[in-house]
């Protein structure tokens, strides 16, 4: 990283359980500012539920990157995987880019985002980041 360029920003964006109209205004505005938007897809699925939660919305002109992951209860395997993922985003952050990461439901509730932000902060303790809450499926059902 060069000293003249500040480190980019990482944002976790909870997109809610779907449909798209359950995305918060603050999260939508942040999504518009992202240079790169990453979205998770379980290897056991053909498409990303988090990305589908945005169906019907006019998506921002940004670079989009699918992140595939396996569901695993092996903590060592998860830690290694998310550290590798964090390292793969290193170049984007060192270029000063704003990187968004979509999560289905809420970013901090049973989400891949929690693992990724932990790994990123191990690499960059000074990383500027923000987490945008999303509506969980159980909160949506209760409403």
Mark where each language-model region is:
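Residues on a specific face of well-ordered alpha-helices
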Residues: 118, 136-139
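Class I S-adenosyl-L-methionine
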Residues: 1-20, 25-130
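Anionic-ligand binding region
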Residues: 141-143
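Active-site nucleophile and cofactor-binding loops and adjacent substrate-binding regions
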Residues: 130-136
């Amino acid at each position: 990283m060069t000293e003249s360029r500040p480190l980019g920003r990482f944002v976790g964006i909870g997109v809610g359980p779907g449909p798209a109209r359950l995305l918060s205004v603050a999260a939508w505005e942040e999504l518009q500012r992202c240079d790169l938007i990453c979205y998770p897809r379980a290897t056991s699925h053909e498409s990303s539920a988090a990305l589908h939660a945005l169906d019907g919305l006019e998506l921002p002109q940004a670079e989009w990157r699918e992140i595939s992951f396996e569901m695993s209860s092996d903590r060592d395997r998860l830690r290694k995987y998310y550290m590798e993922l964090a390292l793969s985003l290193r170049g984007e952050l060192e270029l000063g880019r704003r990187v968004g990461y979509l999560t289905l439901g809420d970013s901090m509730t049973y989400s891949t985002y929690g693992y990724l932000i932990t790994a990123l902060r191990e690499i960059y303790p000074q990383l500027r980041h923000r987490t945008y809450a999303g509506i969980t499926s159980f909160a949506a059902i209760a409403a």
